[in-house]
């Protein structure tokens, strides 16, 4: 038989190296917020004319029960000073910190400047401030969902003369109840939480558990961040 040569097997091609592609975790988007908002919406829950929202949960009995919790009669100041050292930096809505102006002073009185006008010596002042520059409650007319605000009212109902629906005056006789302080900064062993830290539901639940308190429907929850 004649000589023959074995055919060489073709060399195996090396598979291209797999790229190590790590999926970047997606952050919260506006679409997420809109979707969740529709899912959890309470619009219409208390009727089409409602302007109170979850304050409807507070009943006279809840206020009476809250009053029974007072033991020591201590009063805690939660307000901010109305002065130029407030929290506003102008980055949102062009807001500024309160400007306190004296219109009449004790030195005016001593100098006799008031005696010939009203015959009364007095001090008087005024404060110039956006309403978001100190301690305050947001009305349901404050933030819009598209062209609507709470309960489906048209955003145009807030005009240059003020809010014709969902104004803060609707809360005047409703903001009474049991207060629960959740000291998240203390739970995290921080004097203050870092700027921009997002407090999660788990943070609130764990803080409440550590403090031995239970947040109930109709409670007013105050969260301490250490920022102020």
Identify the role of each PLM range.
Residues 1-5:
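Short, Lys/Arg-enriched N-terminal segments with co-localized hydrophobic residues
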Residues 7-228:
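Active-/binding-site microenvironments in catalytic and ligand-binding cores
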């Amino acid at each position: 038989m004649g000589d023959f040569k074995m055919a060489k097997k073709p060399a195996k091609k090396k598979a291209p190296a797999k790229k190590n592609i790590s999926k970047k975790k997606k952050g919260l988007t506006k679409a997420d917020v809109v979707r969740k908002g529709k899912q959890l919406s309470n619009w219409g829950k208390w009727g089409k004319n409602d302007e109170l929202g979850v304050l409807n949960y507070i009943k006279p009995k809840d206020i009476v029960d809250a009053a029974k919790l007072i033991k020591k009669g201590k009063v805690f100041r939660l307000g901010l000073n109305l002065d130029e050292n407030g929290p506003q930096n102008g980055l949102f809505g062009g807001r500024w910190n309160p400007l306190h102006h004296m219109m009449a002073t004790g030195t005016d009185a001593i100098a006799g400047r008031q005696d010939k006008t009203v015959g009364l010596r007095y001090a008087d002042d005024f404060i110039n401030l956006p309403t978001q520059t100190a301690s305050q409650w947001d009305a349901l007319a404050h933030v819009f969902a598209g062209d609507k605000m709470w309960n489906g009212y048209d955003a145009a109902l807030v005009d240059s003369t003020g809010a014709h629906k969902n104004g803060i005056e609707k809360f005047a006789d409703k903001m009474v109840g049991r207060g629960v302080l959740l000291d998240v900064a203390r739970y995290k062993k921080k004097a203050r939480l870092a700027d921009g830290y997002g407090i999660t539901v788990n943070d609130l639940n764990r803080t409440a558990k550590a403090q031995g308190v239970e947040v109930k429907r109709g409670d007013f929850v105050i969260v301490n961040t250490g920022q102020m």
